Amino acid sequence: MEGEMQRHIKLTKAQTTPVVLVVGDPGRVDKVKVLCDSYVDLAYNREYKSVECTYKGQKFLCVSHGVGSAGCAICFEELMNNGAKVIIRAGSCGSLQPTQMKRGDICICNAAVREDRVSHLMIYSDFPAVADYEVYATLNQVAEELKVPVFNGISLSSDMYYPHKIIPTRLEDYSKANVAVVEMEVATLMVMGTLRKVKTGGIFIVDGCPLKWDEGDFDNNLVPERLENMIKISLETCARLAKKY
C-alpha cells in the first residue's frame, strides 16, 4: 500500500523514489543535501536518515544506512520493498593498494568480496557480488566528464573493522590478490540487488590504508574538495538514472 510505512526507515512507498543514493553516516546526508538544488527532510530513525533531493530537475532520495552489513541490509530491504529500482552506495574506504591509491582518491567498484555475514544467509557463498553495469558505466562516464580521476576495482566488504589477535585479518592476502579497497557494505547491497533485480553500484573515497594503521595512515577528516567531487559524481549519476527509471 502507498501509505504503509517501512518499520525502520520510516518511509512509505509514496515517499520512495526509484533512484536512491545511500551513505553510511547520517551526517553525510547533510553534506549531500546542501549540494542539491533543493531538498526536503523526510525521516530520521536510528541510523536511518532520509532526504528527498532535487538535482538538475530530477528527484531521488539520499538515505543513511549506518555501519555494517546487518543494519544496512535492513535499509536496503525496506527501500526495495518500497519500489527502489536503483541504489548507489557512496562512502569512505581504506586503500588496499597504497602505492597506487592514496587518501582522497576515489574508487568506483565493479564487484566485491563477500566478507560480510548477512548475504551468506540469503544465498550460497559461491554467489558473486557484482555491480550493475549501467550504474558502473554511468559513474565512470560522469567522473570523466567532470574531469575527476578515479580508480576502478574490487572492494572487500568486511564485517571486521578492528582486527583481533586470535584470528588474523585477510587484508594482506586480498591486497596481494589486487583487491582495491576495503569497506563494509557494498557486497551486501550488490547481492541483494541481484536477488531483487535492483540495479546497484558503489563509489568510495579513500580515508587511509588499514595495512599502515600503525604508521598513522588514517584520517576521516577528508579534504572537502575531494569529498565534494565524490558527492557530485554520485548526484549527477543519480539524476541521469532518474530520467530513465
UniProtKB/Swiss-Prot annotation:
GO terms for molecular function: purine-nucleoside phosphorylase activity; uridine phosphorylase activity. Keywords: Glycosyltransferase, Purine salvage, Transferase. Its EC number is 2.4.2.1. The active site is at residue 207. It comes from the Eukaryota. Homohexamer; trimer of homodimers. Phosphate binds at residues 24-28, 46, 89-92. GO terms for biological process: inosine catabolic process; purine nucleotide catabolic process; purine ribonucleoside salvage; uridine catabolic process. It comes from Plasmodium vivax (strain Salvador I). This is Purine nucleoside phosphorylase. Pathway: Purine metabolism; purine nucleoside salvage. As part of the purine salvage pathway, catalyzes the phosphorolytic breakdown of the N-glycosidic bond in the beta-(deoxy)ribonucleoside molecules, with the formation of the corresponding free purine bases and pentose-1-phosphate. Preferentially acts on inosine and guanosine, and to a lesser extent on 2'-deoxyinosine and 2'-deoxyguanosine. The keyword Transferase applies. It catalyses: inosine + phosphate = alpha-D-ribose 1-phosphate + hypoxanthine; guanosine + phosphate = alpha-D-ribose 1-phosphate + guanine; 2'-deoxyguanosine + phosphate = 2-deoxy-alpha-D-ribose 1-phosphate + guanine; 2'-deoxyinosine + phosphate = 2-deoxy-alpha-D-ribose 1-phosphate + hypoxanthine. GO terms for cellular component: cytosol. PANTHER family: FI09636P-RELATED, URIDINE PHOSPHORYLASE. A purine D-ribonucleoside binds at residues 8, 184-185. Belongs to the PNP/MTAP phosphorylase family.
